[in-house]
């Protein structure tokens, strides 16, 4: 699907679920960002190869580069949430985000591996499958740009 087609799947209910869960997840960008990344690495060890510049990711919060990447990731998600009501702007920021991943030869399928860790981080904050499915639809917008 095109990026616009994927963005069209973000219905009013999906946007509400994204915003409601983001209020909690986004309130601790550093902690939840590091949790997201360390869960990605634990569940999909092959993804560590894309992040060699981060050094020893097993250090978690003690790794400055991992913390920096995690915080940057969370602000990208904040940007996506902020643009949910304007599909043109959402596509613009998603495509900018996608460039960083295309440069590193990260495919749509590889990028989709983030859905499992997102589901786990959401579950740790008592957000169930409905919310994980909403985030998967947002991830699909990024995947369409890759």
UniProtKB/Swiss-Prot annotation:
Organism listed in the record: Anadara inaequivalvis (Inequivalve ark)
Main location: cytoplasm
Residue ranges annotated for the Globin domain, each copy included: 9-146
Signal peptide: none
GO MF entries: heme binding; identical protein binding; metal ion binding; oxygen binding; oxygen carrier activity
Subunit structure: Homodimer.
Top-level lineage group: Eukaryota
Chain segments annotated as coiled-coil in the UniProt record: none
CDD domains recorded: Mb-like
Annotated protein name in UniProt: Globin-1
GO cellular component assignments: cytoplasm
Disulfide bonds: none
PROSITE patterns: GLOBIN (PS01033)
Keywords: Cytoplasm, Heme, Iron, Metal-binding, Oxygen transport, Transport
Locations listed in the record: Cytoplasm
Phylogenetic placement of the source organism: Eukaryota, Metazoa, Spiralia, Lophotrochozoa, Mollusca
InterPro entries, sorted: Globin (IPR000971), Globin-like_OT (IPR050532), Globin-like_sf (IPR009050), Globin/Proto (IPR012292), Mb-like_M (IPR044399)
């Amino acid at each position: 699907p095109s990026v616009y087609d994927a963005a069209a799947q973000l219905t009013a209910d999906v946007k509400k679920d994204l915003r409601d869960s983001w209020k909690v997840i986004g309130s601790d960008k550093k902690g939840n960002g590091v949790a997201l990344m360390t869960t990605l690495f634990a569940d999909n060890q092959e993804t560590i190869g894309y992040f060699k510049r981060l050094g020893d990711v097993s250090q978690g919060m003690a790794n400055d580069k991992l913390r920096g990447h995690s915080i940057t990731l969370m602000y990208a998600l904040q940007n996506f949430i902020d643009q949910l009501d304007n599909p043109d702007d959402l596509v613009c920021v998603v495509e900018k985000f996608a460039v960083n991943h295309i440069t590193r030869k990260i495919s749509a399928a590889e990028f989709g591996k983030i859905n499992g860790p997102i589901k786990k981080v959401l579950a740790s904050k008592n957000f169930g499958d409905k919310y994980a499915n909403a985030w998967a639809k947002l991830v699909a917008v990024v995947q369409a740009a890759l």
